[in-house]
Amino acid sequence: AIAEIVTEALRLEETDEKHSNYRLITPVFTEIGSKDYGISAGYGEIHFTIRSWHQTDMEAATNDFMNEVQRIADEHRLRLESEIVAVFASNQNNEDVVKAITDSAKQLGLDMTERSEPFPWGEDFGLFTQRIPGAMFGLGSGKNTPALHNPDYDYPDELTPTGVNLFYQI
């Protein structure tokens, strides 16, 4: 059943970041049975991260996926327990705030790269931008720096003055 659930997650994904229905359903943890050979697993657990650009799409992706998970559990006569552990609300940048950030960066002579699509990772910051105007930006640490949240990422302290100056300018 767990293999079917993972397959269903892949089927429900829309991985094209430019697509209006962009959604990722990524397995992040799996545990099945125990190391007792010759018997079927009596327990399984699987965790997913679900991502999309907008909160309503996130809720729809979650509902679509959970309906399919329940269907698979029913087909295999399994008892399903589900829990939403962590929600990272989608971040919606406010155009006026984005302009203030870009104007400030230009005034400071900073190089800027504006992505055509947002980063696909979620942050708690989205909870703020759902209630008050805001925008999320990053300070680049170079192409040879490991990606943020990678185990080998080490924040380059020399970025701190740039960030402080930019926030002060904004």
Regions found by a protein language model. Give the residues of each.
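Midchain, well-structured core segments that form catalytic/ion-binding scaffolds
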Residues: 1-93, 119-122
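Zn-dependent metallopeptidase/amidohydrolase metal-coordination segment
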Residues: 112-170
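A local structural motif
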Residues: 80, 107-114
